[in-house]
From Swiss-Prot:
Per os infectivity factor that mediates the specific binding of occluded virions (ODV) to the host midgut target cells. This is Per os infectivity factor 2. It comes from the Viruses. Pfam families: PIF2 (PF04631). InterPro entries: PIF2.
């Protein structure tokens, strides 16, 4: 009898727990079905609602500021902590801030005209200040913005396109493709100051308004001088579409190639220069978008055979260009120019007839070509 009652109450308990979920499931399903059935009838209403809806622009959103109150229960406040205290128009290195701030750890700092200190969204004016928060010691003021955040100073890069790092003294301009620069030469891509006529030195004041400052003739004051060489020992050059970027020569894998071999960014092509001078031409004949190399696809007229460029792996192959599908370069292939490829010739692959069926054998053609005048319908052997 007791077992029957236990089973009965168990079923009642499960029913009480399960029933609300089941009713909610049915209600949601019916509501969704009604919505789907009447969606086409309410398209005009939905369109009118979306037309009247106005989104709040981001500049109209409230600006949240952290106003920290670190006072004691007696009402005392810690001075010079949340906001630095202005004390002088001139630089007073020996100024004692401990009395004004009522704190022996308070320190004095001076803001020059070129320094950028930001507190609560406003830049500090020139002058001396007292603060109980210590300034970042390894923060280069020439390339940094020193921002007062929640009870501490934060050193951020003024323009990370030029300089960044822990102290914002690491040059990034011209060195974006660090993995494509020959080891030990990344520092040869320098940022040059055309107004002062020297390389930019961020440890001194450059007297600039911004890194994108223009000269009187409308040209950039700061420009890149790409003197480093890429991993193929070819001279790098400035990207015409980005004056802050030094590019490797992406148009060839040949090392020490002639300087006239370079990309043409306006047309997306590669300029291989004069083949008699550069000793390279387009890998795909007639395709100016292909890379420049000395080993290319072509036709050997003396043997009526096509040659095909086959990329391979040698001791000079970069890890970036390695592939399991590449063959090892033949031992007799000259590969010290870093162009890892060899020419694979298919004997007798050039068809003399129009349909490629009425052909002499390759050996028969070689034996009789000096005595027999074969009809070359394509005219490429003459």
């Amino acid at each position: 009898m007791y077992r029957v009652l236990i089973v009965f109450f168990l079923f009642v308990f499960l029913y009480i727990v399960y029933q609300p979920f089941y009713q909610a499931y049915l209600h949601i399903g019916h509501a969704q079905q009604d919505y789907n059935d009447t969606l086409d009838d309410r398209m005009d209403y939905i369109e009118s609602v979306m037309r009247r809806r106005h989104y709040v622009p981001i500049e109209a959103l409230p600006a949240i500021r952290f106003d920290t109150n670190l006072g004691t229960l007696a009402g005392d406040t810690i001075k010079c902590m949340s906001v630095p205290l202005f004390v002088s128009d001139i630089d007073l290195p020996m100024f004692d801030c401990s009395q004004i701030c009522d704190n022996p750890s308070a320190a004095y700092f001076f803001v020059n005209e070129t320094d950028v200190f930001v507190v609560n969204g406003h830049r500090l004016t020139v002058g001396g200040y007292c603060s109980t928060n210590s300034l970042p010691r390894n923060c280069n003021r020439e390339t940094s913005v020193i921002l007062m955040s929640l009870n501490q100073w934060t050193c951020i890069a003024e323009d990370p396109r030029y300089y960044a790092g822990t102290d914002n003294m690491t040059q990034l301009a011209g060195r974006q493709h660090f993995d494509r620069i020959m080891p030990g030469q990344s520092d040869r891509n320098v940022l040059f100051d055309r107004l002062l006529g020297r390389e930019v030195n961020v440890t001194t004041n450059t007297f600039r308004r911004s890194w994108d400052e223009l000269l009187e003739d409308g040209t950039r004051r700061f420009e890149m001088r790409c003197n480093a060489r890429d991993n193929n020992n070819n001279l790098m050059f400035v990207n015409p579409l980005n004056p802050l970027e030094c590019l490797p020569n992406v148009c060839t894998n040949v090392s020490n190639v002639h300087t006239s071999v370079r990309p043409v960014f306006e047309t997306g092509e590669c300029d291989c220069g004069d083949e008699a001078v550069t000793r390279v031409t387009h890998i795909v004949p007639g395709d100016r978008t292909s890379m420049c190399a000395s080993i290319i696809d072509g036709l050997d007229k003396s043997t009526a055979s096509y040659r095909y460029r086959v990329e391979c792996v040698n001791l000079y192959t970069s890890i970036l260009n390695y592939s399991n599908n590449k063959l090892l370069c033949p031992s007799d292939t000259f590969d010290s120019n870093t162009d890892a490829a060899f020419a694979f010739e298919v004997p007798g692959s050039y068809p003399l007839s129009r349909n490629g069926i009425n052909e002499p054998t390759y050996r028969f053609y070689l034996d009789t070509r000096s005595r027999v005048n074969y009809n070359d319908v394509r005219g490429q052997l003459s």
